[in-house]
């Protein structure tokens, strides 16, 4: 009789525990015009490339610096395979390879609601960052809703010039031996 009570209490406590969603989404920011994109791939994100374009304008009677910078394109690497380039490969390229057990846990930056994503910062769980563009206009900050999640994919829109909107999708990666190791291991 006592064991029936213990089992019943155990099952009731299991049902009372909140079930944590393994995925979350940070809503897209930006103008949102152009061709939609969704990055995807097998395994963890192991590398990132971001292209930024900086425009400086000169006027007739005086020098005027316009800090009109924007993200022209980006690319994610899943395992050893690079995704297509979303946007275009124009301007200056910034690149970051992730270490083993390193993951992107925050996406932040600035956007101009009239045109492009102007600044993009990707931060890892090791505290490393990749920063592209110039910080001006409206801020955004994306991070996972659940502990232990990491960036799984980016979505949004781009046109022939740059990225017009961006959103982040977070989740768990269930893989044995996931990482960015290129070394060969031998067993004895």
Language model feature labels by segment:
Residues 2-188:
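Lectin-type carbohydrate-recognition ectodomains
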């Amino acid at each position: 009789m006592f064991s029936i009570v213990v089992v019943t209490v155990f099952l009731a406590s299991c049902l009372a525990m909140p079930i944590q969603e393994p995925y979350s989404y940070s809503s897209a920011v930006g103008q949102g015009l152009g061709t939609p994109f969704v990055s995807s791939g097998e395994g963890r994100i192991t590398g990132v490339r971001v292209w930024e374009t900086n425009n400086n304008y000169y006027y007739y009677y005086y020098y005027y610096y316009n800090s009109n910078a924007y993200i022209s394109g980006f690319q994610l690497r899943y395992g050893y395979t690079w995704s297509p380039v979303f946007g275009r490969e124009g301007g200056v390229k910034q690149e970051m390879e992730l270490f083993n057990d390193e993951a992107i846990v925050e996406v932040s930056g600035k956007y101009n609601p009239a045109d492009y994503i102007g600044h993009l910062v990707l931060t890892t769980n090791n505290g490393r960052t990749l920063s592209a563009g110039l910080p001006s206009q409206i801020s955004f900050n994306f991070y996972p809703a659940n502990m232990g999640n990491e960036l799984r994919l980016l979505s949004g829109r781009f046109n022939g010039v740059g990225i017009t909107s961006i959103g982040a999708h977070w989740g768990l990666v269930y893989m044995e031996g996931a990482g960015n190791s290129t070394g060969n291991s031998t067993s004895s």
